[in-house]
């Protein structure tokens, strides 16, 4: 089976639309975050069925909860594996600036969340790296190591010096 478009996302559906999918069996395509950026790939569902994913250019990244296929009593949904991350919570704007500058020099991929997010504080989230953890420990910057399903995958930012 070739999947060429995402039909919707379970997390974004209004309650009345979600009811249409309630009785369906959910077959999952479990992907690590790094695979979400690939438009063309092969994947195997948790039932052992192989599928091909061939999304159009510009279709955006896959996300946790994306509905790939619906038929009769079954649906195929993307399930994203948690990513090992460092959740960094600087105490002051100065500490944030110094930390962001130091980590930015490493070309570290990061995501930023505000206090209204699931983190409950303004934080910077980056993929786990032991050298970053060592820097944060020595600099005294508050952080925690967590397993998280991120809303969007880390993506390399193109640049030149």
Swiss-Prot record:
One of its GO terms (biological process) is protein folding. It comes from the Bacteria. Gene3D superfamilies: Urease metallochaperone UreE, N-terminal domain (2.60.260.20), UreE, C-terminal domain (3.30.70.790). InterPro entries: UreE, UreE_N, UreE_N_sf. GO terms for molecular function: nickel cation binding; unfolded protein binding. Keywords: Chaperone, Cytoplasm, Nickel. Signal peptide: none annotated. It is found in: Cytoplasm. Pfam families: UreE_N. One of its GO terms (cellular component) is cytoplasm. The keyword Mitochondrion does not apply. The keyword Lyase does not apply. Belongs to the UreE family. Involved in urease metallocenter assembly. Binds nickel. Probably functions as a nickel donor during metallocenter assembly. This is Urease accessory protein UreE.
